[in-house]
Amino acid sequence: MGMIRAEKLVFEYDKRDEEGNVIGSHRAIDGVDIDVPQGSFVAILGHNGSGKSTLAKHMNAILVPTGGTMWVDGRDTKDPNELWNIRQSAGMVFQNPDNQIIGTVVEEEVGFGPENLGVPTDEIWKRVENSLRAVGMLERSCLLYTSDAADDMQCVD
């Protein structure tokens, strides 16, 4: 079994009226089979509205299948007890990187991931320092994230 695997994957978005009542559905994914071995690089291509983003959101359990099954590292994305493990195994980079900037300064941005994994604060600061040193940005750790700093942030992202 691959790192990412889907069998007969189906996903439908609900259509709702003004009061929020379900009045129908739109099938965005219809019977997709995919098997991606660990370490592979895969491009998912298609025109607007073809289901690329919907499929990607299944790969880290942001969405769960309406039908069929999606596994990430052997874990079924429909199992609520596996969500934490799945999301540690598979991340997502959004189309516009600025939409995923969390911190206001570089060191906050670098420390965001380990903080969400429950890494102790002292260890986070050590990792932040080591990471910024590794990419030659230690002296810019308190740089505010603005459009002027975008080129520097590309080193961090």
Predicted features along the sequence, with ranges:
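Conserved ABC ATPase "signature" region
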Residues: 6, 122-140
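Helix-to-loop junction immediately C-terminal to a conserved catalytic motif
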Residues: 60
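Conserved small/polar residues in nucleotide/adenosyl-binding loops
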Residues: 145-151
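The feature captures the beta-strand-to-loop junction immediately N-terminal to the Walker
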Residues: 45-47
